[in-house]
Amino acid sequence: KLIFTTGVIPALSSAVRKLTTPAENVLIQTPVYNNFFNSIRNNGRNVVENELLYDGKEYRIDWEKLEQQLADPQTTLMILCNPQNPAGNIWDRETLARIGALCKQYDVIVVSDEIHCDLTKPGTEYIPFASVDDTCRDISVTCIAPTKTFNLAGLQTAAVYAENSILHHRMWRQLNTDEVAEPNAFAIQATIAAFQYGEEWLDELREYVEKNKQYVTEFLQEKIPLIHPVAGDATYLMWLDCRKITESGRQFAKFIRKTSGLYVSGGNQYGKGGEGFLRVNVATSKLVVEDGMQRLYESVDAWLKEEKISK
């Protein structure tokens, strides 16, 4: 039931083209990976943002709003991010089943981007959307890849899974039409090698990334308490709540880059709910993370001094 392709984003764009028609709505849950917007808008479809509710500690789904948006006859596709990027949520079985039931009720197909599925916190369970129940299996297309986990993005390799024979055929046709259905021979062999022989390395990586996250959390608590890291159980990314400092993550990210040379992503690009947040990648050596946190500290200090002067 797997269809090989050159990347998750090309597959998402193909799904939007094949499973919807122009001017229809595609629902996403923001803040979410910014390329989702491109895959939707570049193909002449409308973005519907189901903003996740944030209580200062964690994110949850606004179920009432979600049902209203799915009930709109113009909404025909939902792109689910599982695990969620940038917040790091791993949606539990009950949540996924509820999403599946609502989408089935309102005839909405689910495309589940599960590219971060192998990058979970050690000891934490990840649940594929299609595995939850028959409903989730029959109404969904799942996108997976080794590219985040094993740093193989440059090889352009991914796969699409669809148990439903009709969805499987439609995706196969569109991926071939778009000429993104055949990864190169080297990518195929690298993918096989990664999954066959990379388990021990991956376990060590997950432990290492988790320690980096713990370091960042402790550093912020001690040195920059105005920034609050959102607790996430997946991805090698950290989602930082900077709203006690600024409401514009975009401007803050630019300032940090200018003053310290540290590259972080402003939260505004991830849609509603991303304002005042930063996304930080900690999939690197401890020394680089330590240096990055020191640069962040210096930039925050400079920002606060400028704010004080301007007032």
Predicted regions and their residues:
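N-terminal small-domain helix-loop-helix segment of the aminotransferase-like
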Residues: K1-G7, S14, K65, A194-Y197, ...
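PLP-dependent enzyme catalytic core of the Aspartate aminotransferase-like
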Residues: E67-Q68, C136, F255-V264, Y270-K311
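Conserved glycine-rich beta-strand-loop-beta hairpin in the small C-terminal domain of fold type I
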Residues: A185, I192, Y208-T217, P229-C242
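Conserved PLP-anchoring active-site segment centered on the Schiff-base-forming lysine
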Residues: K18-I40
